[in-house]
Regions:
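Rossmann-fold NAD(P)H-dependent dehydrogenase/reductase core
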Residues: 2-218, 298, 302-308, 321, ...
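C-terminal helix-and-tail extensions that cap enzymatic domains
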Residues: 21, 263-266, 273-329
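A short, mixed-charge helix-start or loop-turn motif at secondary-structure junctions
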Residues: 24, 171, 175, 232-236, ...
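C-terminal helical subdomain
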Residues: 182, 208, 232-273, 282-283
Length: 329
């Protein structure tokens, strides 16, 4: 018998009818499973991706299920800021006066080619971090009072600090380093967003999570041949999850009552997990936040009136240390 992500997450009996959720990168992998789960729970789901045929298939699957869920598909290339803005606009229209209840920042991947986007930013960093940052910033005023922002990160975030000078160059490019840097940015972004919202007495929460190593997602399509072949065998190992299992933590953070007031934290397997020391550094989180606005050429979101970023208490502490290597797609 198939076990759905919402059942694994312990929220299979919840109903979130009249709520709206955006799941980016939801035409395959854990994004698709997350979108289907939220649809089964009754939400109106904005499905996002670049493959229109795959997107329509997810919409049909949600609307064909025996529940009250509905869906629509919006195509957007996350390497293009204008398309991210169009996705934000379409989501705003879908949410209406009730606001957006759930934002799952899941789109991303592992890209082995050294290249810059049209904005002059290293491609992996732009797609995996800068576009989720932009999308979230553009939707801040459209979030419901108790909305939840969930960002797919990875245990792959553990590594060197982010060198801001590397973000606009591809000299000595390393695909793994680019991926690791983008995943560290995901954890730092989620923590900083949580802090800035909390400093404004907002009930909106922001958390990140590690989904597990998932060969069934689209992560491995960009790996070099030998690595891709080796990765394909990971699905036979017991510590590697399926897309449905990987989606369970996203669904848990989006729906479960017990985390309604939890913000700025990092999760794995539906439990808080301590991220890297660098990921917890509030100064590094603040620098990334400010640099991201500069790279996009926009005003700093949620900037304090006096120009400061608020308190310096670190987010993401606590939890267990188990979990396998992760990816987002």
């Amino acid at each position: 018998m198939t076990e759905y992500p919402e059942d694994v997450a312990g929220v299979g009996d919840e109903r979130i009818v009249d709520s709206t959720a955006l799941v980016t990168g939801s035409t395959s992998g854990i994004g698709r499973e997350t979108a289907l789960a939220l649809g089964r729970l009754g939400a109106h789901v904005v499905v996002h991706g670049r493959d229109a045929e795959a997107g329509r298939a997810v919409v049909d699957a949600i609307e064909d299920a025996v529940n009250e869920g509905t869906a629509e598909f919006v195509r957007a290339d996350f390497a293009q800021p204008d398309e991210v803005s169009r996705l934000a606009k379409r989501t705003r229209e879908a949410a209406g006066d009730g606001g957006l209840d759930v934002l799952i920042n899941n789109a991303g991947g592992y890209f082995r080619e050294a290249r810059l986007t049209d904005l002059g930013v290293e491609y992996t960093f732009h797609v995996n971090h800068l576009s989720p940052y932009q999308l979230t910033a553009e939707l801040l005023d459209d979030l419901a009072d108790d909305a939840r922002v969930v960002t797919t990160a990875s245990e792959g975030h553990r590594g060197d600090p982010i060198d801001l000078d590397e973000l606009t160059a591809v000299d000595d490019f390393s695909s793994w380093r680019a991926y690791q840097r983008s995943k560290l940015a995901n954890v730092q972004f989620a923590a900083e967003l949580g802090r800035r919202l909390r400093d404004r007495d907002s009930a909106v929460t922001s958390n990140s999570f590690h989904p597990g190593a998932i060969p069934g997602s689209g992560f491995f399509r960009h790996l070099p041949g030998p690595l891709a072949a080796a990765a394909g065998g990971l699905g036979r190992l017991p510590f590697v999850t399926t897309p449905a299992d990987g989606a369970a933590t996203a669904v848990y953070l989006a729906v479960a009552d017990e985390v309604a007031d939890t913000t700025g934290r990092y999760f794995a397997d539906r439990r808080e997990k301590t991220p890297s020391t660098e990921a917890q550094d509030p100064r590094a989180q603040r620098r990334l936040w400010e640099a991201s606005a500069d790279l996009l050429g926009v005003d700093e979101p949620l900037a304090a009136a006096d120009g400061s970023a608020g308190s310096d208490d670190a987010g993401g502490a606590g939890g267990s240390d188990d979990g396998a290597e992760a990816t987002a797609e």
